[in-house]
């Protein structure tokens, strides 16, 4: 449940002048609203709450205030633990706490730096806290756990810490706050295992509108790399994509685009596919006389710190990185981003874009050179959610895994990202039918399993005595996964229904979540793969007879068992309920509220 940003009650005066003057930084209005929402939730008895705040909104600045005002649940339980997963996040949290809480003892527990477990405030690495290192923290002495970048919470490392502090359920014995800019996961895992309610949300588009973030200006760059490969789940396609992206032609297109569009920008951050790609792109910049440096995971700590500090001081104009500067690093002078790393994840794309949106003196906007058509391919209007599969349903999750947005006169260089996103949202309302058809065709790129698009936003996968169905919600574009299991009661066979997951933001995520669930059932690949041997064999007599009864025209000699199985699935799950779903869609598109939205669309286009 998402609370309104305007809280039901305030625990202090709106201006906060007397409350916050002891702190190093005064909170912005939305930060005050967020803090009020969290404390009100604790006051109402909620113990595990979530906050969704845009990248660059100053989440870390809230930590000292949470520590100061969070209620104690037991006598003498005043200690607080801040949990992060990256060194940069730990150092930021440490800096804010030391500046704003000078009278508190503050320690860090990460890598070779070991804390006593007795400090008033400890900033710790999630991955360092295990075995004896976790046991030194006495749960009875703690009032608050703060999880930064909490969208990682579904992993076992986080759940282990929650269990140690007695916070594994809504009857938690300690207050828990989880913060992130992206409160959803691309792998289908839910966050409800550690959090119970989203009490505050502020999207980065809202932050741009209110001038708390700079406006992005987007230019789509035509890249020679085949971006269709980026949407494929095939390992071979992903390898082919990496190879194409590292061709000499594709590599040099990146610095040439910078020279054409961004040579007047002071600080450009480039996102690349992997380390090899980063090094080649960096060398291409340097061959064209541009001072570029490369940063990736293997860069040692001292060199990394020097690179980032020099980049902050604008000593060189281009920093090329691979999966390092996506979370937590505060470099507000970045005024240009180059996205040369295809992604279908709203999480990752939001984090990448957020690197360039922070306010900075003399910075009017952030130019985004998008080589991957990211803003057309990935929806960033995704509401925060705790929904998804529980961790025990996803422990065996696999490790590997164009159409025009608007009218042809639309120019993202003029209108910027805010207009792109809003226009995309409206477009979905009046072209729901077309979008569903596009998704039906793209199902083959999203999975190698034999999903069948039966029409009107429904996708079906049959195996053993089970059927998984993904249905599209026409009102908000989310997806629901249902499982039907054939069971026998006496002589009667019936289907038992179970909702596996709901309100999944995209079809790709729904497919991933469903296949995560299937893998946990240890379903043989030979039953569900689109390339299974049995699907290539001739259709059985039983299949042919069923289809004949359905009055379908058949070429029995050419009909394979796989094609016949798909046709049967369409007959059973497509026809039944199709009219109901059609009526729902038509009703939604004709609703008065949406007519207003369509009117707004026409005005925007005009």
Swiss-Prot record:
Gene Ontology biological process: mitochondrial DNA metabolic process
Keywords: ATP-binding, Helicase, Hydrolase, Mitochondrion, Nucleotide-binding
UniProt cross-references to Pfam families, sorted A to Z: Helicase_C (PF00271), ResIII (PF04851)
Disulphide-bridged cysteine pairs: none
Location in or out of the cell: Mitochondrion
Span(s) of short sequence motif DEAH box: 148-151
EC number(s) recorded for this UniProt protein: 3.6.4.-
InterPro entries: Helicase/UvrB_N (IPR006935), Helicase_ATP-bd (IPR014001), Helicase_C-like (IPR001650), Helicase_Restrict-Modif_Enz (IPR050742), P-loop_NTPase (IPR027417)
Organism (species): Schizosaccharomyces pombe (strain 972 / ATCC 24843)
GO molecular function: ATP binding; ATP hydrolysis activity; DNA binding; helicase activity
Residues the record lists as binding ATP: 53-60
Name assigned to this protein: Putative mitochondrial ATP-dependent helicase irc3
Keyword Transferase annotated: no
Family, per entry: Belongs to the helicase family. IRC3 subfamily.
Residue ranges constituting the Helicase C-terminal domain according to the UniProt record: 246-398
């Amino acid at each position: 449940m998402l609370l309104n940003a305007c809280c039901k009650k305030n625990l202090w005066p709106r201006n906060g002048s007397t409350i916050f003057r002891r702190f190093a930084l005064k909170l912005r209005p939305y930060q005050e609203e967020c803090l009020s929402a969290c404390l009100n939730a604790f006051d109402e008895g909620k113990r595990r709450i979530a906050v969704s705040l845009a990248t660059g909104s100053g989440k870390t600045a809230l930590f000292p205030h949470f520590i100061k005002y969070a209620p104690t649940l037991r006598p003498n339980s005043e200690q607080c633990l801040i949990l992060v997963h990256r060194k940069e996040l730990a150092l930021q949290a440490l800096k804010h706490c030391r500046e704003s809480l000078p009278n508190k003892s503050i320690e860090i527990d990460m890598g070779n730096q070991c804390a006593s477990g007795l400090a008033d405030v400890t900033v710790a690495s999630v991955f360092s806290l295990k075995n004896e290192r976790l046991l030194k923290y006495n749960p009875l002495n703690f009032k608050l756990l703060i999880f930064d970048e909490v969208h990682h919470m579904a992993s076992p490392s986080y759940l282990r810490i929650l269990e140690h502090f007695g916070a594994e359920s809504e009857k938690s014995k300690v207050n828990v706050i989880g913060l992130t800019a992206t409160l959803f996961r691309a792998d289908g895992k839910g966050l409800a295992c550690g959090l119970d309610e989203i009490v505050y949300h502020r999207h980065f588009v809202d932050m741009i509108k209110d001038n708390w973030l700079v406006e992005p200006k987007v230019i789509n760059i035509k890249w020679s790399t085949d971006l269709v490969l980026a949407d494929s789940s095939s390992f071979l396609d992903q390898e082919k994509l990496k190879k194409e992206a590292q061709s000499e032609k594709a590599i040099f297109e990146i610095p040439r685009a910078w020279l054409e569009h961004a040579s007047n920008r002071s600080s450009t951050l480039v996102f690349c596919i992997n380390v090899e790609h980063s090094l080649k792109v960096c060398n291409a910049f340097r061959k064209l006389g541009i001072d570029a440096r490369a940063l990736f995971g293997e860069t040692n700590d001292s060199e990394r710190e020097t690179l980032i500090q020099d980049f902050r001081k604008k000593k060189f104009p281009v920093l090329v990185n691979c999966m390092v500067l996506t979370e937590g690093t505060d470099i507000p002078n970045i005024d240009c981003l180059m996205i040369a790393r295809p992604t279908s994840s709203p999480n990752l794309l939001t984090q990448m874009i957020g690197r360039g949106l922070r306010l900075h003196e003399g910075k009017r906007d952030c130019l985004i050179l998008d080589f991957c058509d990211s803003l057309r391919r990935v929806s960033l209007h995704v509401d925060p959610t705790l929904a998804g599969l529980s961790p025990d349903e996803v422990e065996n999750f696999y490790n590997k895994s164009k159409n025009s947005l608007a009218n042809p006169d639309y120019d993202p260089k003029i209108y910027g990202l805010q207009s792109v996103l809003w226009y995309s949202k409206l477009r979905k309302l009046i072209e729901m039918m077309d979008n569903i058809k596009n998704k039906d065709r793209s199902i083959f790129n999203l999975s190698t399993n034999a999903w069948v698009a039966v029409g009107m936003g429904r996708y079906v996968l049959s195996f053993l005595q089970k059927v998984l169905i993904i249905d599209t919600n026409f009102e908000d574009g989310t997806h629901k996964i249902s499982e039907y299991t054939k069971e026998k009661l006496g002589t009667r066979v019936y289907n038992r229904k179970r909702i596996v997951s709901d309100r999944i933001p995209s079809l790709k995520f729904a497919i991933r979540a469903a296949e995560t669930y299937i893998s946990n059932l240890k379903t043989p690949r030979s039953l569900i793969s689109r390339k299974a041997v049995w699907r290539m064999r001739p259709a059985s007599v039983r299949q042919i007879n069923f289809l004949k009864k359905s009055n379908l025209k058949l070429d029995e000699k050419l009909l394979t068992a796989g094609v016949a199985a798909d046709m049967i699935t369409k007959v059973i799950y497509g026809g039944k309920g199709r009219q109901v779903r059609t009526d729902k869609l038509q009703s939604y598109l004709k609703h008065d509220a949406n007519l207003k939205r369509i009117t707004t669309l026409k005005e925007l286009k005009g």
